[in-house]
């Protein structure tokens, strides 16, 4: 275990991803908020924590509570802690994704740059504008970990599915807006590891279970323990699937407008 950790910290790619992250987001280290984030400091902590809980974002609520408990509840201190978590999560997500896909992509440059385009895109840039950016980017790291375990399950042992479900559940408890990323990336591995139509359909069902079960559990927890349930209402499966398809097209076909169309599919 110690050797593996040492190997990671000796890998130059980790530091290159770190440099890229700082170049993109370093300017946001100073205290600046999206308009919604000012609400955090304009009302009692308990009220905003309750809003997080009603939204199913238990980890976000815990983050806010811990910051207040450790006397980190001032705007500057909380923002700094959140920014550091976001930077670490962004670097870790890109590095893990790179190590997952490098065996599948012969072109080393593309194998290196694709994780950057997936993790650092127009959606994640927007997340960095919020006070709770740390937990939001942490949810992206959790989604990448979920893909990692899902890939392991398709390759070797279905027991890894439990870890994948657990990671998706934690991501739901952090920020549900990133969960579609898990489905988009995992769908590629479903295609890769399906030897026939029957296996393809079965793997898609498994993928659906890994996505839906944590969402239902998250919704159930909120429904049982909080009277008003989710602020945004119930789970809309059709809308969720539609959103996933939109994200899939944005990444696989449009390449977020950063590269020529269909390049990811060609690779």
PLM ranges: what are they?
Residues 84-105, 145, 149:
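Transmembrane-helix motifs of polytopic, lipid-linked glycan transferases
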Residues 111-141, 145, 173:
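Aromatic- and kink-enriched transmembrane "portal" helix at the membrane-lumen/periplasm boundary
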Residues 91, 137-148, 164, 181:
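Alpha-helical transmembrane segments of multi-pass membrane proteins
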Residues 73-85, 106-113, 156-163, 167:
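Membrane-interface starts of transmembrane alpha-helices
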Residues 23-90, 130-134, 168-169, 173-190, ...:
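Transmembrane catalytic cores of multi-pass membrane glycosyltransferases
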Residues 12-15, 51, 104-113, 157-161, ...:
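Membrane-interfacial loop-to-transmembrane alpha-helix junctions, especially the N-terminal start
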Residues 143-161, 195:
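Membrane-interface transmembrane helices that cradle and orient dolichyl/undecaprenyl
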Residues 1-23:
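Start-transfer (signal-anchor) and selected internal transmembrane alpha helices
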């Amino acid at each position: 275990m110690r050797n593996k950790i040492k190997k990671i910290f000796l890998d130059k790619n980790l530091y290159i991803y770190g440099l890229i992250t700082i170049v993109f987001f370093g300017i946001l280290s100073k205290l600046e908020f999206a308009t919604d984030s000012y609400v955090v400091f304009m009302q009692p902590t308990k009220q905003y924590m309750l809003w997080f809980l009603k939204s199913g974002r238990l980890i976000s609520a815990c983050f806010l509570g811990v910051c207040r408990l450790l006397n980190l509840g001032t705007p500057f201190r909380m923002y700094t802690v959140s920014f550091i978590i976001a930077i670490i999560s962004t670097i870790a997500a890109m590095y893990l994704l790179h190590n997952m896909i490098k065996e599948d992509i012969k072109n080393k440059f593309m194998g290196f740059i694709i994780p950057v385009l997936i993790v650092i895109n127009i959606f994640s840039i927007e997340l960095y504008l919020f006070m709770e950016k740390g937990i939001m980017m942490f949810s992206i790291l959790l989604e990448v970990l979920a893909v990692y375990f899902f890939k392991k399950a398709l390759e070797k042992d279905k027991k890894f599915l439990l870890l994948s479900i657990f990671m998706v559940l934690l991501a739901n408890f952090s920020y549900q807006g990133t969960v579609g990323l898990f489905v988009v990336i995992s769908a590629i591995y479903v295609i890769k590891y399906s030897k026939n139509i029957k296996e393809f359909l079965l793997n898609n069902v498994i993928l659906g279970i890994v996505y839906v079960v944590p969402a239902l559990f998250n919704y159930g927890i909120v429904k049982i323990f909080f009277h008003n349930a989710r602020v945004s209402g119930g789970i809309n499966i059709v809308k969720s699937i539609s959103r996933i398809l939109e994200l899939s097209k944005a990444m696989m076909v449009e390449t977020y407008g950063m590269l020529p169309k269909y390049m990811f599919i060609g690779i």
